[in-house]
Curated annotation (Swiss-Prot):
Chain's role: Component of the cytochrome b6-f complex, which mediates electron transfer between photosystem II (PSII) and photosystem I (PSI), cyclic electron flow around PSI, and state transitions.
Subunit: The 4 large subunits of the cytochrome b6-f complex are cytochrome b6, subunit IV (17 kDa polypeptide, PetD), cytochrome f and the Rieske protein, while the 4 small subunits are PetG, PetL, PetM and PetN. The complex functions as a dimer.
Record protein name field: Cytochrome b6-f complex subunit 4
Alphabetically ordered keywords of this record: Electron transport, Membrane, Photosynthesis, Thylakoid, Transmembrane, Transmembrane helix, Transport
């Protein structure tokens, strides 16, 4: 059973703390022993059971052995590097491709200074940041999909 400690609102010291915004964590269900002995082990065991269950149901097998005499036509990087690979593959000048890669972190560093007047946490009330985020997300997905296609179809995604 959990132990609940009810506040005594007639206490003047407690009322002074509550007026200052303090005391909200003093009451309710205690972390020891309820959370640390009962809830956390259940979550940890549930996570382990989920990982083991997924490993048993769908094991990840190793691929074919590497053959040094049969090189594939195009070697693709890991999935999270597809947009970068696509930029470097499509841009004719490699120095320009590297310069485009440096613009991404520079744009992310400049973004807070562009819209520092608006202090709202709601992203829909911050149109510049929201539009740049959506544009970047769509562009990243477009480049990632294009990297999986042959180079002649990569810019149009094979649609035209």
């Amino acid at each position: 059973m959990s132990t609940l400690k009810k506040p005594d609102l007639t206490d003047t010291k407690l009322r002074a703390k509550l007026a200052k915004g303090m005391g909200h964590n003093y009451y309710g269900e205690p972390a020891w022993p309820n959370d640390l002995l009962y809830i956390f082990p259940v979550v940890i065991l549930g996570t382990i059971a989920c990982v083991v269950g997924l490993a048993v149901l769908d094991p990840a097998f190793l691929g074919d052995k590497a053959n040094p005499f049969a090189t594939p036509l195009e070697i693709l990087p890991e999935w999270y590097l597809y947009p970068v690979f696509q930029i470097l593959r499509v841009v004719p000048n490699k120095l320009l491709g590297i310069a485009l890669q440096t613009l991404i972190p520079l744009g992310l560093m400049i973004l807070p200074f562009i819209e520092n007047i608006n202090k709202f946490a709601n992203p829909f009330r911050r149109p510049v940041a929201m539009s740049l985020f959506l544009f970047g997300t769509v562009l990243t997905m477009y480049l990632g999909i294009g990297a999986c296609l042959p180079i002649d179809k990569s810019l149009t995604l094979g649609l035209f």
